[in-house]
From Swiss-Prot:
Name of protein: V-type proton ATPase 116 kDa subunit a 3
All ranges on the Cytoplasmic side of the membrane: 1-409, 475-556, 605-623, 710-798
The gene coding this protein: vha-6
Membrane side Extracellular: residue ranges: 431-453, 578-583, 645-688, 820-865
A Pfam family reported for this protein in Swiss-Prot or TrEMBL: V_ATPase_I
Keyword Membrane carried by entry: yes
Glycosites: N578, N670, N687
Length: 865
């Protein structure tokens, strides 16, 4: 547990590179991923650094790759991932890469340009073809006469809305048909009505329009298809022709010149059909060639992207180095884990060899006051739990890491709230599938964020499922039902005749009669308690919640105070690691005393009440305990402790004397006694009031000790010029200010004192969520599955199948596992972040972010953020 218990020792190193070997050495360090470089040129802008031209060339190549990727995506061509290792390309190969990408870009741009022109020409030819095919019917004598009559009416001011199907006999004078001019073209069908109305209004009905829909598709090489219409516009006069063409341009209607001679139109139509066929063949060949280029580019795109990514990242890293006056040596500073310095030196040696340089890179370890970054060596199992801790804050350098303890406590507290063995089995199966097929799933490189969240935490979910099964057996809860594995410790004390008579009486009166099992005779004392978990008989009891709720509530308090106490113990490890005697003596010990004198004392009371105070009368701590009615009330007792309220010294007086008013049998002997008023509030062990008064005084005195001693100690050290560690992490700067230190210590003291109370209450969420999950599971069983089980015959079989497989299963997974599981997961995170980690964890450190090709490539592939 060494490396994950505390962060790795870090060293600030200075490396001297020869200019000709710097690139290859940095490439080797990128493959190793163990050096976090520091920018030594922060005061310089990006345009004045040494390798700015190389970075610009990389940016231009990146733009070209993005353009190619957009073209590939536009054609819906899949881009395969590249899984083989690709070494970083040499700087001398940049020219070749640029030439290849520039050639590909120019080729695609030219193909796109030619395709666009060819497609436009092809559309125009098809539209011209449609116009020629329909213009004969539009230019028939009937249409011309109809147009002439309409325009004549408009000229005399008698025109109304344009109408079709006019009678041949019309007694009004008409304009000569030979004087009519016409314009033909194509317009989108969706604009035809607006086009016609606009022409009618602007020309005052002196333009006559007719439309025929084109049945044949005119855009064969486009995914977008719009219906179009052939139109013909009749009018008189060349002046009106100019207006008509402007309107056509405004409605994006294309006008085509059509010969009036039918023979010429026929000849032109044949010619256009030949051109259309030839144009289609040319476009198909062009698109086929483009498709080959796109598929070839898609095969190598990820490879080019990774090569460029490594190239650019190396030059970006080199720009962080300082250059000596001779311009022949680069100087870098970086953080390296102390245990991996040997590997870094070996990578520098390999880089020098591969570059062909005769002068090796030199690494020197530096002494520094800079705050080191935090680095833990993790594996695929511990990574998920460390992510939970890091989401709160990065650990301070060499601070105790909560992750090792979170591996056990987090899934356990989750299971306390989730506790159902049946649902835990489903969760375990799902997580096991992730673990078993993890290599295959990793190779698939799934980029879905929700999937990656579950897959990244697969070992967390695996332990959550295991612990949920464990707590499910503790609660004896399996899909809201209990399982009788070992046999109940409770027996029926009533004879069958009495039960039969009561059953008949209940049936006659239409009421449900309930019986109470007296623990003195119904509990099998020889068999003892149920061997593991809750006795299954409680699942049948009416007062089931009256029994389970106090048990779960007290268990929550015990678990919560235990975890908080453990967190304070871990703070001792931080104080020892920091060699801070004042924190150990005047912070840690008062915290232990405050927590122990009040809350640990409460936990001891809970345990003693469970162990000693049974339903049977007995002598406990030398005092008569009359029975369960005198079992101590812990909550009111704790309040009386703070109020220093006087109480009787025992549960009863006049014990064993003739003055006793009541009697009980203890160890086979009759014992008389007179019970005290509110016996459950009285003292239940000798000198309880004195002990609690001492504990309360110790807790009260601990508060000013925590508040005052450390600030005045720091002030004393500062007055003598000694080193002061304020424990503020990497942001510890500025002059000494006693007021700030006093306020800081007061905040921590108040937070701890009030937090002990609020955090203890916060752990009651363990009980609340466990109750909610159990009740939801019971409701789902009662409302869904039990209804189908009560149905008989074929209908019952069908109901079981339908309700179980399609309703009960879906609701169980969606509500009880996913939603309730997420709720319990979030509450478990809160308990660890606030209640547990606040006792010892600073979380203000700096994450170690080494220059690592693996990390950069995963971000490029969309697998990491």
């Amino acid at each position: 547990m060494g490396s994950i218990y505390r962060s790795e020792h870090m060293k600030l190193c200075q490396i001297f590179f020869q200019s000709e070997s710097a690139y290859q050495c940095v490439a080797e360090l990128g493959e190793l991923g163990m050096a976090q470089f520091i920018d030594l040129n922060e005061e310089q802008n990006a345009y004045t650094r040494k390798f700015v031209n190389e970075v610009r060339r990389c940016d231009e190549m990146e733009r070209k790759i993005n353009f190619v990727e957009d073209e590939i995506t536009k054609d819906l061509v899949p881009i395969p991932d590249y899984d083989e290792h690709i070494p970083a390309p040499q700087p001398k190969h940049m020219g070749e890469m640029e030439a290849n990408l520039e050639k590909l870009e120019e080729e695609l741009v030219q193909i796109n340009k030619n395709c666009k022109v060819l497609k436009n020409n092809h559309v125009q030819l098809l539209e011209m073809k449609a116009v020629l095919e329909h213009v004969t019917s539009l230019l028939d004598p009937h249409s011309k006469r109809e147009a002439a009559m309409s325009i004549s009416e408009a000229a005399r001011g008698e025109a109304g809305p344009i109408s079709f199907g006019m009678k041949d006999e019309f007694d009004k004078p008409v304009k000569d048909e030979k004087e009519l001019k016409f314009v033909t073209g194509v317009v989108k069908r969706s604009k035809a009505i607006a086009f016609e109305r606009f022409l009618w209004r602007l020309s005052r009905a002196k333009v006559f329009a007719k439309f025929i829909q084109i049945q044949e598709q005119t855009e064969l090489f486009s995914n977008e298809f719009e219906d179009k219409c052939v139109f013909i516009l009749f009018f008189s006069g060349e002046q009106l022709r100019a207006k008509v063409k402007k309107i056509c341009d405004g409605f994006q209607a294309k006008c085509y010149t059509v010969p009036e001679n039918p023979a010429e139109r026929t000849k032109l139509l044949l010619n256009i059909k030949v051109q259309t066929t030839d144009m289609k063949a040319v476009i198909e060949k062009t698109l086929d060639y483009r498709s080959k280029c796109i598929h070839a580019a898609a095969t190598n795109l990820r490879k080019w992207g990774i090569m460029l990514l490594k190239l650019k990242s190396i030059f970006h890293t080199l720009n962080m180095f300082s250059v000596d006056v001779t311009q022949k040596c680069l100087i870098a500073e970086c953080w390296v884990p102390e245990a991996d310095i040997g590997q870094v030196k070996n990578s520098l040696h390999m880089g020098t060899i591969h570059s062909g340089s005769t002068v090796p890179a030199i690494l020197n370890e530096m002494e520094t006051d800079k705050y080191p970054p935090t680095y833990f060596k993790l594996n695929k199992f511990t990574q998920g739990f460390q992510n939970i801790v890091d989401a709160y804050g990065i650990a301070n350098y060499r601070e105790v890491n909560p992750a090792p303890w979170t591996i056990i406590s987090f899934p356990f507290l989750f299971a306390v709230m989730f506790g159902d063995a049946g649902h835990g089995i489903i969760m375990l199966i799902a997580a096991s599938a992730f673990v078993i097929f993890e290599k295959k799933l990793i190779s698939m490189k799934i980029k879905d964020e929700i999937f990656n969240t579950f897959f990244g935490g697969r070992y967390v979910v695996l332990l959550m499922g295991m612990f949920a099964i464990y707590t499910g057996f503790i609660y004896n809860d399996f899909y809201s039902k209990s399982v009788n594995i070992f046999g109940s410790s409770w027996v029926n004390p009533y004879n069958q005749t009495l039960l039969a008579n009561m059953d008949a009486q209940g049936a006659d009166s239409n009421t449900d009669l309930s019986l109470t099992f007296p623990p003195e005779i119904a509990f099998n004392h020889d068999y003892g308690p149920y061997p593991f978990g809750v006795d299954p008989v409680w699942n049948l009891a009416i007062n089931r919640l009256n029994f389970l709720n106090p048990m779960k509530m007290k268990t929550s308090i015990l678990l919560g105070i235990s975890q908080m106490a453990f967190g304070i113990m871990l703070s001792l490890m931080n104080h020892i690691g920091n060699r801070s005697v004042v924190d150990i003596v005047f912070v840690f010990i008062p915290q232990c005393l405050f927590l122990g004198c009040i809350f640990v004392y409460l936990c001891l009371q809970v345990l003693m009440k469970w162990i000693f105070f049974y339903v049977k009368p007995a002598y406990i701590f030398g005092r008569l305990y009359p029975g369960s009615n005198c079992a101590p009330s812990l909550l009111i007792g704790l309040i009386n402790m703070f109020m220093v309220k006087s109480r009787d010294a025992s549960f009863a007086h006049d014990v064993g004397t003739a003055a006793g008013k009541e009697w009980v049998i203890v160890n086979g002997q009759n014992v008389t006694y007179t019970i005290n008023d509110q016996c459950y509030l009285q003292q239940w062990y000798p000198n309880q009031s004195l002990v609690e008064l001492i504990l309360l005084l110790i807790a009260v005195v601990s508060v000013p000790v925590m508040l005052l001693v450390k600030p005045f100690y720091i002030r004393w050290r500062h007055s003598r010029g000694l080193h002061i560690d304020l424990g503020h992490g990497p942001d510890e700067h500025g002059e000494f200010n006693f007021g700030d230190i006093m306020v800081h210590q007061a905040i921590h003291t108040i937070e701890f004192v009030l937090g002990c109370v609020s955090h203890t209450a916060s752990y009651l969420r363990l009980w609340a969520l466990s109750l909610a999950h159990a009740q939801l599971s019971d409701v789902l069983w009662t409302m869904v599955l039990r209804m189908s089980l009560t149905m008989g015959g074929w209908g019952g079989s069908a109901a079981i199948t339908i309700l179980f497989y399609f309703i009960f299963s879906i609701l169980s997974v969606c509500i009880l596992i996913l939603m309730e599981g997420l709720s319990a997961f979030l509450h478990a995170i809160r308990l660890h972040w606030v209640e547990f980690q606040s006792k010892f964890y600073g979380g203000t450190g700096i994450q170690f972010e080494p220059f690592c090709f693996t990390k950069i490539i995963r971000v490029y592939e969309g697998l990491d953020q």
